[in-house]
Each structure stands twice: as C-alpha cells, then as structure tokens.
Amino acid sequence: EVPLDDTGL
C-alpha cells in the first residue's frame, strides 16, 4: 500500500 504522498515511489 502506498501513501497518498507517494514521493518515495
């Protein structure tokens, strides 16, 4: 699950 702030993606 990725967070809404998926800057690390």
UniProtKB/Swiss-Prot annotation:
Its main location: secreted. The keyword Secreted applies. GO terms for cellular component: extracellular region. This is 62 kDa cell wall protein. Keywords: Cell wall, Secreted. It is found in: Secreted, Cell wall. The keyword Secreted applies. It comes from the Eukaryota.
